[in-house]
Amino acid sequence: MKYILLGLLLMVVLANANRLADPNCGVCTLRSICFMEKESCPKGFKMLCF
């Protein structure tokens, strides 16, 4: 259980670091309405659109 939580925390940190590098890149969240792929985003990251 501890390792699962650490993994989730690491994913959040990496996602936020990526978002700082390119504000248009983000990861899927339950709050988001839709997602669009963006070529400049690293693989697995998507552009947030609200």
Curated annotation (Swiss-Prot):
Tissue expression notes: Expressed by the venom gland.
PTM field: Contains 2 disulfide bonds.
Broad class of the protein's primary localization: secreted
Cellular component terms (Gene Ontology): extracellular region
Keywords: Disulfide bond, Secreted, Signal, Toxin
Annotated signal peptide: 1-17
Family in the record: Belongs to the scutigerotoxin-02 family.
Protein name: U-scutigerotoxin(02)-Tl3a
Annotated source species: Thereuopoda longicornis (Long-legged centipede)
